[in-house]
Amino acid sequence: MLYELFLTIVFFFSSFGFNEFNEISTCNDDEVFEIFCGFQNPEDLYLSPSKRKIIVSEFGSLAPNTKFGNLVYFDLKTKKREPISINYEANQWGDDTCSLEDKRLSPHGIDLIERNDGKYMLAVVNHLPRETIELFELIETDTIELIWRGCVDAPQNKYFNDIALKKDGSFYVTSMFDSNISEWSLVSASIFISNTGEVFYWGKENGFDVLSNTSGSFPNGIDLSSDEKFLYINYWFSGLTVKFNLLE
């Protein structure tokens, strides 16, 4: 309820600044955009290793709501939305204390990387039935298949947003705000640009640590440079995207 209500308020007020917009509910292309419908709240996208498919995170909801989402892909050749099959094996990549509670999920940010062992790893910020990072091995042929390789439970009261993987299987993740924040405190933070979250680092041996000097107003998207020396972090409320030096 909190996240959905907040977005409704934000878009209501921001709509007064729109000069014009095109109606796309009929899924008709225009001179600028080719429109593809049939997706549920597409939240994040990632190009597959073959560059012939786009992995799509279909957001559901945040707890205590119970609307689940999906992981699907968009075939760039056929221009069709396709399901992704998931097989479940032992927890090898995640936290040993994390267990699979439900095969359904509510995905948010995603990231894909070729690990040091040559396997493709897909990490998914997941909000249901509890706040976790879900870790999958991705296998691409004519379709995309996933093998569940583990999960990591989020720190208490944290709502994650987006994730950036390292080749060793560790990752950085943005915490956008705490789950116990009130709706109006979040609205106030968006107006006065006050800090609501930070970036966490997770490694298999030591778990989560807050990354110093990353606190900001609604940390949102995150990406890691190919040499793993820099993070690119977006702070939604402040309208900033920063380059963060991991070596300093």
Tell where the protein language model's regions lie, with residue ranges.
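Blade-loop segments of beta-propeller domains
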Residues: 69-116
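Surface loop/turn motifs at the tips and blade-to-blade linkers of beta-strand repeat domains
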Residues: 35-38, 85-88, 99-102, 151-156, ...
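Residue-level detector of Asp-centered blade-edge/turn motifs that repeat once per structural unit
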Residues: 48-51, 113-118, 165-168, 226-227
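Beta-strand-rich domains and repeat architectures in extracellular enzymes and scaffolds
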Residues: 34-70
